[in-house]
């Protein structure tokens, strides 16, 4: 069962689509991790990367523009809920390449020396250039393997961007201010 104690008083508990997420919360990377090679741990910032970090941040900023649409209402009626569903769908589509990047990064880390920094770098370039990620994935079976292995890992700042970011840049005190646990929590 699920206990939720926090809600907007006087309003129904609605639109949990964006709040309840399934995934491995211990092994997912944050966006900053995606700017490093998963095997070597080296930053992706050399001249050969052609300002890949800046382009990737710009693309993420464009995707995060959809967060405001999602947070524009509280879901007080059917029209509001429809608007939230549409906004959530647009946000998910915009963040999908970054979530794929996070899955591949995690899978590559899990593979260790069998992972491929080169395949990861090629995918980063594809995402930064806003190219079709599925075509790129199908051309490199190693990416599919890494994606499958890391697919359940939860990248918190890509799943809950409104909590961890403000206008596409990391906040100093970003994150959750809660502890979730099973009752009886008075015995912790």
Regions found by a protein language model. Give the residues of each.
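SAM-dependent methyltransferase catalytic region
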Residues: 1-188
